[in-house]
Amino acid sequence: MTNFDLLKLLMDKKVADSFQFFTSCQYKLDMAELSYNALKNLIKKYQEEETEVINKVFEDAKRTGKGTYKLHKNVVDFFGIEIDTTVAIEKVFMEIMGLLHNFFDTFAQWINSSLFGEQALPIKRASLVNVINKMSAFPEYTDQFITDFTNITANQNYSYVADFNNTQKHRYQLYVQNKFDLFSVQGEVSIQEFEKDGRSGSFVALSPKRELL
């Protein structure tokens, strides 16, 4: 069999289509990782600036007997545009969640085309749920990867990504909440709590993202 014959066979069996979905999955995760690192730096910058401001309040109080906390803005330069740090955090977080949501859609397309071959679902019908349901028609696929894939919609992290994006798209905007304790000089950046279909969503903005990625 020549290389051309092999390629034709793979294309006829729809397997060759899967490579584009594989590379797209990889690219989306790389972009999400990039945004995650930006989010980490933004949160670090915000907390360092707030720590500096609050420490100065205590230093002034110790030196003069009076320390005053003044309202101020934390800003970052976004390619020549000055924006509030909280807005920047929200922007990057939304990028991450959108990329992860898109990843799962493309991941389903990859499974559909690479494992189902000629029996693959049409692209417009190859949602994650439909692909998982069709997997039962292929009992020869039985390893841990397949088990993890078929259980993915029950995973708490997947549910959060899906619920977050659906809430943003169809219901209302979810905002980042910056909190900084003046006395302990400690900050926390979290996401506004929300509820969808009886499931509640809430966690600190930074630490769970690594697990999601």
Residue ranges and their predicted role:
Residues 103:
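Active-site hotspot residues in diverse enzymes, especially metal/ion-binding acidic/histidine motifs
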Residues 1-98, 108-213:
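Acidic, Ser/Thr/Gly/Pro-rich intrinsically disordered interaction regions
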